[in-house]
A protein has these predicted regions:
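Dynamic helix-loop-helix/coil hinge segments at AAA+ ATPase domain boundaries and subdomain interfaces
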Residues: 1-8
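Pre-Walker A adenine-sensing motif
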Residues: 8-20
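Residue-level signal for alpha-helix termini/capping positions
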Residues: 18-21, 46, 106, 143
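Residue-level preference for the first positions of well-ordered beta-strands
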Residues: 24-28, 51, 111-112, 148-150
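Conserved P-loop
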Residues: 26-28, 32-95
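P-loop NTPase motor core
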Residues: 96-171, 175
């Protein structure tokens, strides 16, 4: 049985991973502040003909649209065509985020998801065990719906390692370090 693989359609990156990543994988995209994690996530969504979802726990939807505009990406048009769903969510109300993501997947038949960021979300969850459970639930949701996902995590300047909480890399299927 062959594994379906998903290309990112990002020049330079696809040369590093020429076959793409396995469909339904959850990839950790991590790096220091200002390394282009949000832009990478947006590029992953806008460069694909498949519908996608961008979930933001920090930036407003207007900020996300403005960032995309600087690269010539018309997110509003994609939203109007049901090729993209932007979701701004308050991390203080985490209990129903999985339902919101599930409903968004069904509404536009999404195949790609970007969560920006697990760092912001995790700071409101607090306990590492709860963060790990939430990450596993997200991974299960993505697999169940045959989506391919990116979760963004910021590396704090004072931390050694590749993620904020030190657990994200153990719950995801692959890591991209910017």
């Amino acid at each position: 049985m062959s594994i379906k693989r998903i290309k990112f359609n990002i020049p330079g990156f696809d040369a590093l991973v020429p076959e793409g990543v396995p469909e339904s994988d959850l990839i950790l995209l991590t790096g220091f502040a200002g390394t282009g994690k949000t832009v990478f996530g947006l590029h992953f969504l806008v460069s694909s003909p498949e519908p996608g979802i961008f979930v933001s726990f920090e930036e407003s939807l207007d900020q996300i649209r403005e960032t995309a505009e600087t690269f010539g990406w018309d997110l509003k048009k994609m939203e109007d065509e049901n090729k993209l769903r932007l979701v701004k969510y308050d991390p203080f109300r985490i209990e129903d985020i999985m339902d919101i993501i599930q409903n968004s997947i069904k509404e536009i038949n999404a195949r790609r998801i970007v969560i920006d960021s697990v760092s912001a979300l995790g700071m409101h969850i607090g306990h590492k065990n709860d963060i790990r459970i939430m990450m596993q639930q997200l991974n299960n949701l993505i697999r169940k719906n045959k989506c391919t996902g990116i979760v963004i995590s910021e590396i704090p300047n004072i931390r050694e390692g590749i993620s904020r909480f030190g657990i994200e890399e153990f719950v995801t299927d692959g890591i991209i370090l910017l």
